Amino acid sequence: RGRVDSSLEILLKIKNTKDYLVRPDKWWKERSIIARSLIYKKKYETAYRIASKHALEEGPEFAEAEWMSGWIALSFLNDPILAKSHFLNFYQNVGYPISLSRGAYWLGRTYEKLGKKEESIKWYKEGSLYLTTYYGQLSHMKVYPNENFELNNLMEVDKKIAENFYKKDLVKLIYLLDELNKDKYSKHILRYLANENKLKGSEILAAKLATDISRYDFAIQVSKIASYEKRFHNKFNYPIINVPK
């Protein structure tokens, strides 16, 4: 801590190869700290060098390193061409809505700076698909600056499918566990039911069942897992509950 110069000396001298570093993911934590310290000192080119020479190839640290490298390139070096490759690497190596919207938004910013309006709008629209995230909302404001946004309506489950769902023995078991105050054991059953037929609404039915027995936490879990695969059940992911008495 506080030894930026001595740390920098080490980071600039060592070989930036995976074989040499052995665990470049462990080195990244220090690189991140030093890079941010250098930004504070307005040493932007050195900060970019430290961030981008990470020797990572995959994993969350790789994604984080690529985003930071792109951010420094775009925001401080004013080099959108350099930033573009980093943001693309980030976007292609993440899967959660919060990260996908982040990558899409910054790609939109990058193409905007390059003067490529169509590409910029394309990425902002991609980011705006994730309206429950910060960058999703920023993306929406870029594409539709004067329009309010609404979360997508919940898909409607076929009435016959819903009727058959509630006839299942496992569903009856969930209600029984609730009556016996043993609803904590229903978590994995609900997860199983949610995975039965996702395209036909099994996740929605499982989340509703969890809500029926006041296990909003289980409903959120089902909905959040679905959101990782770009199926958004916002009614259950962000429930409105009564104030406890």
Indicate residue ranges for each PLM-predicted region:
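Cell-wall glycan-active module
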Residues: 1-245
